[in-house]
């Protein structure tokens, strides 16, 4: 069996070309103004700084602007909330990204939820998640939404299929399950307390690795002909799924790197563009 590669890197590049055309149209209509993404980085974590830079570069590639706000490691919850409130009230800003994780003294959930729904382009607020869960309009969490866009492009059928999501985080596993449920898949969510995890994964037509541990999901847990989506990325340049033994016996898979990651960033930028289009009418 020759597996289909769900190439997120190439798809993101294609989407960027389409987005640039939309940005050009918007700028012509808005007297040269363009959507602006504000990124907030608290502390000096090198990986987080790299991710923020990548998001700024992606904005630039499609003709949008980004504003990078860097706060000290000692920033308090109150100080961060004040900065978010300032950005909420800045009509020139169309999207707000608070880079995860923040220092331990900060109430991250409170700060996520302080982002206005209209500017929650990373899909991290409880209000946005609740609306999405009820089938109402809201920006989706960037990684699961990026996965859905990837699966849609490659025409991976979800309706009637059994999807197993391994991981239940608030910004990945849970919204991933809800989006797949909305697409009429039958969804099982697994986590660290799940019993008989290998047996459950073996039942899956579609497996989503969202557990945050390198190659935690073993190749022999996955049945022939399944679709494998790996949302993990680790310093060893591997994901959450033991991928190498699978490439000759699954129907399709996301490579690591080059699969889910580029689509996460692309979705963040796309949703910022959508926010800008709404703001400019």
UniProtKB/Swiss-Prot annotation:
The keyword NADP applies. Homodimer. GO terms for molecular function: methenyltetrahydrofolate cyclohydrolase activity; methylenetetrahydrofolate dehydrogenase (NADP+) activity. Catalyzes the oxidation of 5,10-methylenetetrahydrofolate to 5,10-methenyltetrahydrofolate and then the hydrolysis of 5,10-methenyltetrahydrofolate to 10-formyltetrahydrofolate. This is Bifunctional protein FolD. Pathway: One-carbon metabolism; tetrahydrofolate interconversion. The lineage of its organism: Bacteria, Pseudomonadati, Pseudomonadota, Gammaproteobacteria, Oceanospirillales. Keywords: Amino-acid biosynthesis, Histidine biosynthesis, Hydrolase, Methionine biosynthesis, Multifunctional enzyme, NADP, One-carbon metabolism, Oxidoreductase, Purine biosynthesis. It comes from Alcanivorax borkumensis (strain ATCC 700651 / DSM 11573 / NCIMB 13689 / SK2). Belongs to the tetrahydrofolate dehydrogenase/cyclohydrolase family. Gene3D superfamilies: Leucine Dehydrogenase, chain A, domain 1 (3.40.50.10860), NAD(P)-binding Rossmann-like Domain (3.40.50.720).
